[in-house]
């Protein structure tokens, strides 16, 4: 099929088969289509509504092109879709840092901001973490600390083809959905925050197909009526849990875990300097209760899917103990120090 065939199909409101989506994505990533066509395809897909079959087709295209890394299938990824436009600080990033300090291995897949003011790569860089270490250095960092950040452009070089188009479009696209699925470490334990409730079933279908071991797909609402791609501190959090092929669904509230309710404004952030300052204040204990609770809530879920905690309650307890004792701050300083040592030892891997 040529680009006109793909465009006509989308303009008619028809869905792609898995094979058609793989073919279309291959053409996009291999530079067959010009920028204008790619932008039109991405916008029309989003307008039509992406199906689980289309996401699976795109997944198989991108994962075949990825530079994979050998860590551990039990490492947890907290990469979410982003794109909820709630303006929160980088909660999943600090959540993964806290979880790591409790003994959870982390293989966080992430990138610079596309639809937000500050992506996980942006805030880690602002905190002094070099995000673009070569693969062998990332393996060393993980071996010593159990923490790794998998910078998407390094492991998915074909994504450079669409980076500027995504930035110029400034809207959610199928690539937001793919981020949590194409972890180059092939993580089988995941905490996936999604920006809409409709995506929960889509991710369930795709993760079952791709063989996850234990995943929680999370979507939440606030009292203000705002959708979140992370647990809510003042409204319901909807969870689809997948464990060894079995699926169950939960709805939880902050008070179920002894957490106070806080308005959305209490956990909002901004640009990278502001978000990095919030994370530093969480690490040193000077952050607001809301900022700390949001981080602990996410860490608790990461601890649970890792198998390190028996339940979310247990995960919350060990996360709080690690943060309040100073263990999280000490562990993150260790990560930063070794990251700097590796940075001095290895040449830049990606521009």
UniProtKB/Swiss-Prot annotation:
Subunit architecture: Homodimer.
Protein name per its UniProtKB record: Anthranilate phosphoribosyltransferase
InterPro entries on file: Anthranilate_Pribosyl_Tfrase (IPR005940), Glycosyl_Trfase_fam3 (IPR000312), Glycosyl_Trfase_fam3_N_dom (IPR017459), Glycosyl_Trfase_fam3_N_dom_sf (IPR036320), Nuc_phospho_transferase (IPR035902)
GO biological process: L-tryptophan biosynthetic process
Cofactor binding summary note: Binds 2 magnesium ions per monomer.
Residues given in the record as anthranilate 1 binding sites: 80, 111
UniProt pathway: Amino-acid biosynthesis; L-tryptophan biosynthesis; L-tryptophan from chorismate: step 2/5
Gene giving rise to this polypeptide: trpD
Gene3D superfamilies cross-referenced by the UniProt entry: Nucleoside phosphorylase/phosphoribosyltransferase catalytic domain (3.40.1030.10), Transferase, Pyrimidine Nucleoside Phosphorylase, Chain C (1.20.970.10)
Family indicated by similarity: Belongs to the anthranilate phosphoribosyltransferase family.
Cofactor(s), names only, from the UniProt record: Mg(2+)
Source domain of life: Bacteria
Biological function: Catalyzes the transfer of the phosphoribosyl group of 5-phosphorylribose-1-pyrophosphate (PRPP) to anthranilate to yield N-(5'-phosphoribosyl)-anthranilate (PRA).
Top EC group: transferase
UniProt EC number: 2.4.2.18
Species whose genome carries this gene: Chlorobium limicola (strain DSM 245 / NBRC 103803 / 6330)
Keywords: Amino-acid biosynthesis, Aromatic amino acid biosynthesis, Glycosyltransferase, Magnesium, Metal-binding, Transferase, Tryptophan biosynthesis
Binding site for Mg(2+) 2: 229-230
Pfam families assigned to the protein according to its UniProt record, in alphabetical order: Glycos_trans_3N (PF02885), Glycos_transf_3 (PF00591)
């Amino acid at each position: 099929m040529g680009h006109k065939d793909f465009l006509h199909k989308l303009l008619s409101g028809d869905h792609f088969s898995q094979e058609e989506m793989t073919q279309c994505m291959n053409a996009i990533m291999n530079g067959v289509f010009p920028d204008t066509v790619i932008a039109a395809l991405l916008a029309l897909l989003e307008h039509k509504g992406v199906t689980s079959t289309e996401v699976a087709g795109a997944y198989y295209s991108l994962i075949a092109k990825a530079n994979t890394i050998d860590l551990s299938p039990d490492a947890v990824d907290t990469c979410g879709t982003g794109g909820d436009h709630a303006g929160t600080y980088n909660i999943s990033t600090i959540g993964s840092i806290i979880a790591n300090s409790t003994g959870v291995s982390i293989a966080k897949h992430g990138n610079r901001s596309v639809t937000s003011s500050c992506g996980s790569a942006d805030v880690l860089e602002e905190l002094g973490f070099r995000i673009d270490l070569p693969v062998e250095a990332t393996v060393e960092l993980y071996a010593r600390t159990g923490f790794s950040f998998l910078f998407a452009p390094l492991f998915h070089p074909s994504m450079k083809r669409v980076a500027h188009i995504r930035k110029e479009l400034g809207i959610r696209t199928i690539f937001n959905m793919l981020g949590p699925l194409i972890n180059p470490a092939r993580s089988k334990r995941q905490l996936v925050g999604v920006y809409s409730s409709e995506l929960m079933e889509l991710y369930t279908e795709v993760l079952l197909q791709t063989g996850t071991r234990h995943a929680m797909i999370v979507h939440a609402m606030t009292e203000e009526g705002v959708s979140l791609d992370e647990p809510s501190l003042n409204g319901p959090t909807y969870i689809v849990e997948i464990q060894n092929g079995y699926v169950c669904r939960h709805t939880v509230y902050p008070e179920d875990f002894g957490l106070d309710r806080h308005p959305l404004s209490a956990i909002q952030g901004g640009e990278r300097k502001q978000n990095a300052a919030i994370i530093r204040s969480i690490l040193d204990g000077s952050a607001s209760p809301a900022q700390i609770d949001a981080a602990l809530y996410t860490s608790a879920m990461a601890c649970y899917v890792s198998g390190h905690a028996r339940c979310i309650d247990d995960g919350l307890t060990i996360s709080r103990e690690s943060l309040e004792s100073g263990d999280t701050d000490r562990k993150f300083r260790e990560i930063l120090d070794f990251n700097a040592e590796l940075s001095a030892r290895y040449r830049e891997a990606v521009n």
